Structures are given as structure tokens and as C-alpha cells.
Amino acid sequence: MANTVYDVTTWSGATISPYVDIGAVINQIIADIKANQTSQAARPGAVIYIPPGHYDLLTRVVVDVSFLQIKGSGHGFLSEAIRDESSTGSWVETQPGASHIRVKNTDGNREAFLVSRSGDPNVVGRLNSIEFKGFCLDGVTDSKPYSPGNSKIGISVQSDNDSFHVEGMGFVYLEHAIIVKGADAPNITNNFIAECGSCIELTGASQVAKITNNFLISAWAGYSIYAENAEGPLITGNSLLWAANITLSDCNRVSISSNKLLSNFPSMVALLGNCSENLIAANHFRRVSGDGTSTRFDDLFGLVHIEGNNNTVTGNMFSFNVPASSISPSGATPTIILVKSGDSNYLATNNIVSNVSAMVVLDGSTTATRIIYSAKNSQLNAYTTSYTLVPTP
């Protein structure tokens, strides 16, 4: 059996230094893996190790083999936005560290890593058990709101895949940090993603994703977490700070629980289209005024926005503290929860604390909404008579 552990700094088959173009080196290693693992029944994959250091990536990496782990020794995050807004003459360090890859993309491609296999997955099979762990992807230069920004993508998965993992990574100054299409049981955990246009996006369709224990910070123009046509994701234990935004489009049976959301914009959790049987529970929503701008939503959109049926919002803490002069549209009463459409949605034991009058709103198209200890009589604005209210005492 050929060696299955590769160090990008010592592998003898490289034709270029990894410090000059780590993308080219990793592509050469993947070619070596494929050349040495040719039996259908014996393809164990490999580990590609990136020791601590600063590496430039000029060439996009294309991952088209299963059971590949690309790992470093630390996520190495450093806030480049704070750096770029500061006088750094006396700073000890001004670059991200640990296993640090500068995504320069001089080959004309947007992605640092493209996970893609040619051929119909029903014929050639899915890509299985690919892991990215413990290194930093740095887009080098960017500015708020980071989208379209520098147009760079950290990791893009564009083939159907099973058990895809991203763990302990750092992402900074990218338009899109992670995009995963056609995912079955992906696990995205313990990452530090900040100063990117969007952090985590599940596109196409996915099932039983886990998005847990991540720091997702300053996704000003995009999404902290986005999923479409997803079945059964678990989104828990994340800290979403500044422009916190979880948006689900046509998703079912999602559990959004025990997350900390701090945002200076509305739409902290949005269920769009036809979203059903989702659970939003035991989260802390804190809405404040701060830097950054957004024209996507005004304060009538709701911190939680619901379109769909049989969704449950329960046991959440809503802390709203925005100067009246900063509320949009001017003079409006802000909405905490908006049930925009759907039948039999359930709001229970949610606590609202606000420095101004704030409302739970039911659109005229909604039916059979149940509201239990989630609004006082004075906090409910219903454009329908099809609801049940047990007011907060």
C-alpha cells in the first residue's frame, strides 16, 4: 500500500513550493492518491497535512476523491477588519496564523477548494467522508459588507456527498466561506467564520445536517446560515454575532435551539416559502443598534419571520434595545415575531423584553395560530380572527 499520509512541506513529488502555491501542491498530491489507489474495493483515501506556516494559494484545489482529510494545526483566525481599521505599527502580529492559507486565486477561479466529481452520482457514486480540519482560509483583502466583495469562496461542494465534515477551521475575508450542495449528513462544527459575505450555505437539497458550536460573525450582506430544501437539520449551540441571520427556504423539521443571536438588523431567523414542522426553541435573541447597514429588512419584518405550517417557537428570550430614532420605518412599532403565512403555528412561553413597544403580528392569511404566554394583549397585532391567545400575565 502506498503512503497515505502526506505533508505538503516534505512530499517529494511536489514541483513547486507549498509556500508559493499550496493549491498546486495539493492537486499534485490528489493526483498521486488516485494513481496509487486504483482498486474499487481498496481506496482508503489519505491525509494531507498542512503544518503551521503562511501559504499562498494561487491555484484552485479540486477534490474528487472520497475519504480525504485535509488538516492543519490550528484555525489561526485574526480579525482583519479590526486590523484594517486600526493603527498596527506596534502590533505583535498582523496576519492570521497557525496553518494559514492566503487565497489569492490567480488562476481565475473563485474557490480555494472545489469538491466535485464528474459524472452522475447514481452512476459513479457520491463523494464520501471528506474532511477539512484545523486551518485558516484567508481572502487577504476585503471591505464591508463583504458581498460581492472580493468574490472569493473558501470551500464549495458541488457534487452529491455523504458525511462531509468541516471542523475547527478559520475563515476570514471571503464572499462565501462554505457552500455545500446535495449534502447527506454533513457536520459543520467548531469553526470560527467572520468578516465574510455569507458563512454557511446548504444549497440544492440536504438532509440531517448538523451545524453546531460555531462562531459566525459579521455576515453583513448575506447569511450566517442559509439552507434550502433541507430536511431535518440540527442548528444548535452557535454564537451568531452582528448581522445574525438564519434563513431557511422550503425547509422542514429543522431544530434551531440554544443559539445566541446578537444582531443590529431584523430577520434573525426567517422561515421562507413553505417551511413546516420546524422547532425554534431556547434561543437568545438580542437586537441592538450598531454599525453596518442593511436595506433588506425593516423592523416590521420581525426578528423571527414565519411562512409555513405547524412551526413551533417556544422558550426563547427576546431582548430588544434599539433607540426609537433608529427604528425603520420611522415611527413604526417593531415586530418581534411575524407569522406571515400558514396554518397551526404555535408560539409558547417566549419572553419579550423591549425598551420600546414591540409586537407579535399575525398576517391576515394565517389560520389557527396558537399563542400561549408569548404576548400580552397589548403586544398582539392580529389581522385575522383565526387564532387562540393565552396572554402573558
Curated annotation (Swiss-Prot):
Disulfide bonds: none annotated. Its EC number is 4.2.2.17. CDD domains: IFTase. InterPro entries: Beta_helix_2, NosD_dom, Pectin_lyas_fold, Pectin_lyase_fold/virulence. The keyword Transferase applies. It catalyses: Produces alpha-D-fructofuranose beta-D-fructofuranose 1,2':2,1'-dianhydride (DFA I) by successively eliminating the diminishing (2->1)-beta-D-fructan (inulin) chain from the terminal D-fructosyl-D-fructosyl disaccharide. GO terms for molecular function: glycosyltransferase activity; inulin fructotransferase (DFA-I-forming) activity. Keywords: Glycosyltransferase, Lyase, Transferase. The keyword Glycosyltransferase applies. This is Inulin fructotransferase [DFA-I-forming]. It comes from Arthrobacter globiformis.
